[in-house]
Amino acid sequence: MAQQIEAPRRVPLSRGRVLRAGVALADSTGIESLSMRKLAEELGVVPMALYKHVGNKEELLDGMIDVVVGEIDPPVRGTDWKSAIRQRILSARRALLRHPWASHVIESRTNPTPDLLEYLDSMIGIFRAGGFSIDLTHHVMHAIGSRLLGFTQELFDDSQSVDPEMQAIVVRELAKKYPYVAEIAGAASHEGESVVGQGCDDQFEFEFALDLLLDGFERLRHQELTHRPGSQRTQQASR
């Protein structure tokens, strides 16, 4: 008697599966080519099936951002505020480097997503637990800006690859009128996988600026603590 072969069971569609597939599709083809129709084809369903789990493309994008934010490492217990903030920001950066489209989608959102709000709330909590006042925390959150999520808005986009010979010609022309700009533009390239363009190690520059900010925040925190009413230095000064 011939043995019947069972057909493989179809994985049921769920919101999580839809969002993860959206992230994978954006990673492989780019966020510009993402559509509900293409995502449905990728999942082997009709487009209408997606709308049971995401109301529209905007809700899909919000959910995809939450998937990326979910990849950020949780806070490390027992560390000082500076180490905790630095570790999470660099983890956020690694997540965004895995999904290059995510920073543009985050910037396009008019309201933060639930997981993004949870991340921001956690980061604010680290500052507050580290001794920052509400006012100082407010200021440092503005100062650190999008670095909190692992990316920066650059003055000029140098992410496109440039032919070295053409780059040299451009630098020589710049030097005739803008010598200091040319000096920076012609700086020697850094080594490593994070090099962007011809003269900028993006990861190094990101961490350089981040550490400058964190060191500055620590000085402000110390000043605030020593001048706060009830502190030992304030009491000594009032005698």
Set out the residue ranges of the language-model regions.
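Hydrophobic alpha-helical connector segments
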Residues: 73-118, 134-137, 141-144
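Hydrophobic alpha-helical bundle segments that form small-molecule/ligand-binding pockets
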Residues: 119-170, 187, 217-220
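A hydrophobic membrane-anchoring alpha-helix module
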Residues: 198-230
